[in-house]
Amino acid sequence: MSSEAKCPFNHAAGGGTTNRDWWPKQLRLDLLSQHSSKSDPLDGSFNYAEAFKTLDLAAVKKDLAALMTDSQDWWPADFGHYGPLFIRMAWHSAGTYRIGDGRGGAGRGQQRFAPLNSWPDNVSLDKARRLLWPIKQKYGQKISWADLLILTGNVALETMGFKTFGFAGGRPDTWEPDQDVYWGNEKTWLGGDVRYGKGAAGNEEDGGVIVADVEKHGEEVSRDDNGRILENPLGAVQMGLIYVNPEGPDGNPDPLAAAHDIRETFARMAMNDEETVALIAGGHTFGKTHGAGPADNVGPEPESAELEEQGLGWKNSYGSGKGADTITSGLEVTWTTTPTKWSNNFFENLFKYEWELTKSPAGANQWVAKGADETIPHAHDPSKKQRPTMLTTDLSLRFDPAYEKISRRFLENPDQLADAFARAWFKLTHRDMGPRARYLGPEVPAEELIWQDPIPAVNHPLVDEQDIASLKQKILASGLSVSQLVSTAWASASTFRGSDKRGGANGARIRLAPQKDWAVNQPEQLSKVLKTLEGIQSEFNGAQSGGKKVSLADLIVLAGSAGIEQAAKSAGHQVTVPFAPGRMDASQDQTDVESVGALEPVADGFRNYVRSDIKVPPEALLIDKAQLLTLTAPEMTVLIGGLRALNVGTGQNPQGAFTDKPETLTNDFFRNLLDMGTEWKPTSPARHAFEGRDAKTGSVKWTGSRVDLVFGSHAQLRALSEVYASEDGKEKFVRDFVAAWVKVMNLDRFDLA
């Protein structure tokens, strides 16, 4: 036998020391190639929205209702009803959402995958999803896991006597874990040292792409009593929690200190005080927590469990390991006398008793009603009763002055609690779905809600091809430059976030507060452009018969198209930028200024803009922006080259304008960046700006940013840049730029096929 045949086989594909191990600061271009057809088992022709429309929703709900009380021996239902478990499952699916970047949430069924499937706060939810498998199996691809998790939460509430606000389907599944979500930089579960330290260095260490600054630009930051500030945009106080530690900050049973954490984390999920109180009280009207014994009885989470466990985790060696012996959070609390029926008993108990600190059987801090009778049922033994118990975070609703005022109103007005909880639950579970245009099914509520960023429905004939050609001529004759036209269209459309489907050009909110005043949008120039376009709009609409109109939202995008066509013509290319009318103009009354404010970019590498107080490298924030815009690496690359050629930037900043033919759609950015006759030097120790000097004469030829130079520095981006810098790449560059541009302009056009 040869020595080669005897050689042991000790590795498999993907093993060994990786590029990431060698170069941990390497840019994460892989974030732009997630969720491709290569990971999707469904045919390319599969359309989830169309499949959902064929679903018998009533039949699914009937099956779910039957499941609620069909207790299984392998995981018995508390109080004979799975409703509380499924409410927690749905809540924790949706509750990862944060308004800062729109990431997290229920929209892609990510609770099935790491890390969420193994978070400490999601103990036992593996069993909840496994209980649902027969129903998912029955209806197949007509209902996604993402939709099923939320629908099940609704049915759970309804079977326990609560009237929900509605349900919308339309959440297609993904088939792999999201890699772009920055969950924090702690290395241990339930750690919080980094998010409450100076903040992580963002991608400098962990390769994430999100802004990790703890200070909010130009705003008063929210500090707790110890001066702590939670790192942006995180929505949880510890790694692996959905929101807060129910025992109190770092386990300290202080209801007032806990109230600060509650207010901060719920606000980052776009909830106000009333919604927060309603959600906590409404959710804690049902079920119980689980802490029957010490946590050291609980085995590894699903991602660390042995193969034979088949995706289940947290195997419990305490007693039977289930039912009355269940260990989940380590807390052992049941709030109400009717834990499987809607009531106002949570608030009745909260205010009726004085509360004394005690320990759960697992040793966790919790509270018991002082001198109370044993009125609370046992989850698995009808012969037993217990005293009312509460979490530290429950007591926050009584002892925080603002929460207490709301709580007493709900105590005295149960109908107000029911309405507030129904609305807050709907918002919680639908916040990341985007506009109502994406909502599917017979239970979509008719009421339009401000947090949905409403846009009027089209109520007039749209412009035709002849109108479009005429409007382009008027735009180009208006005196506005190519740069101004393209910059404004980009500013309008590039607010879109693929994470929560918010933003975009539809609605023309760029003309409204707060967008019209954002520094990145150059308010003075923006005002001039909008005034000119509004004049063209007014003249056109006034000359029409039959009610035909062009919206400003459409006209802004059309103006960008006209600018690009003119720039391409100047470069010797005849192109027509595809344009689909149908956008409408939102009003200021339809715009929640604070909520829309979350869309303001801290950086936009496409415009060479970065806020001065941001410490994450601008090139990493470019990847962040591109990922939110659902761009691939080639699309990002060609857009950078085209926008630089068209002189799209902020202010009079010449960075990245590597051309002597500005506002002409050439590949000069790539050709000049890759020119070996240029030597680049940083202009300051911060290394944010660079000068490109002639290698022979030393004279300054260009100035560039980190975002510009990364396209020559990063091996993959350089490879892409070479394609567009090549002699045979000029037409491809124009063609690909137009395609990527149209993609961005239409990202929020959910009405288009």
Swiss-Prot record:
Listed GO biological process terms: cellular response to hydrogen peroxide; hydrogen peroxide catabolic process
Site of covalent link Tryptophyl-tyrosyl-methioninium (Tyr-Met) (with W-91): Y243-M269
ATP-binding is among the record's keywords: no
Stated role: Bifunctional enzyme with both catalase and broad-spectrum peroxidase activity.
The record's free-text note on cofactor binding: Binds 1 heme b (iron(II)-protoporphyrin IX) group per dimer.
Organism from which the protein derives: Paraburkholderia phytofirmans (strain DSM 17436 / LMG 22146 / PsJN)
Active-site residues annotated for this sequence: H92 (proton acceptor)
UniProt cross-link Tryptophyl-tyrosyl-methioninium (Trp-Tyr) (with M-269), position: W91-Y243
Name of protein: Catalase-peroxidase
Entry EC no(s): 1.11.1.21
GO terms for cellular component: cytosol
Alphabetized InterPro entries for the sequence: Catalase_peroxidase (IPR000763), Haem_peroxidase (IPR002016), Haem_peroxidase_sf (IPR010255), Peroxidases_AS (IPR019794), Peroxidases_heam-ligand_BS (IPR019793)
Main EC class the enzyme belongs to: oxidoreductase
Modifications the protein undergoes after translation, according to the UniProt entry: Formation of the three residue Trp-Tyr-Met cross-link is important for the catalase, but not the peroxidase activity of the enzyme.
Site-annotated residues for Transition state stabilizer: R88
Known cofactor(s): heme b
Subunit architecture: Homodimer or homotetramer.
Keywords: Heme, Hydrogen peroxide, Iron, Metal-binding, Oxidoreductase, Peroxidase
Annotated catalysed reactions: H2O2 + AH2 = A + 2 H2O; 2 H2O2 = O2 + 2 H2O
UniProt KW Amino-acid biosynthesis keyword: no
Signal peptide range: none
Family: Belongs to the peroxidase family. Peroxidase/catalase subfamily.
Pfam families named in the record: peroxidase (PF00141)
HAMAP family with a match to the protein in the record: Catal_peroxid
Organism classification: Bacteria, Pseudomonadati, Pseudomonadota, Betaproteobacteria, Burkholderiales
